[in-house]
Regions:
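Pyridoxal 5′-phosphate
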Residues: 1-168
Length: 168
């Protein structure tokens, strides 16, 4: 997307929501072609309600949404959540310890689950082989997703249906 956008309209700035992939898949604002990139602590075991915004060098004079003090280089009014910021930093440190080993373990669990689930009639694995190590997407034709979540939950298996940004 970034390459196509750069060719079609080089002045357009690109925002990338990297929350789900942060410290789980190799990526950077540069490799993604992102002018803005957001990440969040809660997806790596850090506190909820704290995130970070990368603003790239092509962004000239960003304007704050809320006017106020000089926090965050004048881009965000309000008291800085120092405890959450420290918690986010610690979560990053902990996540980076043995990161390759953790990612390999996640991928093995994902692959094992995909192998076991593929034996279920009418179940389709939607995730690409070798994809994100922490995501396994599957669909069971004709079954309401909430019923599957509830049935598996009653057996101690935790899954989710849809996504936080899903509407409807």
């Amino acid at each position: 997307i970034a390459r196509g956008l750069a060719v079609k309209n080089p002045q357009t700035l690109l925002h990338t929501d990297a929350v789900q992939g942060f410290l789980k898949v190799p990526c950077s604002a540069k490799t993604l072609g992102a002018d803005f990139l957001t990440i969040s602590a809660h997806k790596i075991g850090g506190p909820k309600g704290i995130g970070a915004l990368y603003i790239g060098p092509r962004v000239r004079n960003p304007k704050p949404l809320l006017a106020g003090g000089g926090q965050e280089s004048g881009l965000r009014a309000g008291t800085e959540a120092t405890a959450q910021i420290a918690g986010f930093a610690r979560a990053v440190e902990l996540r980076q310890e043995n990161l390759e080993e953790k990612l390999l373990c996640m991928a093995k669990i994902r692959d094992y689950a995909a192998e076991r689930l593929s034996a279920i009639p009418d179940l389709k694995i939607l995730s690409a082989p070798g994809g994100a190590p922490h995501i396994l997407s599957a669909s069971l034709v004709g079954w309401p997703s909430q019923n599957i979540v509830n049935d598996l939950g009653s057996q101690g298996v935790c899954i989710s249906a849809g996504s936080a940004c899903h509407q409807g």
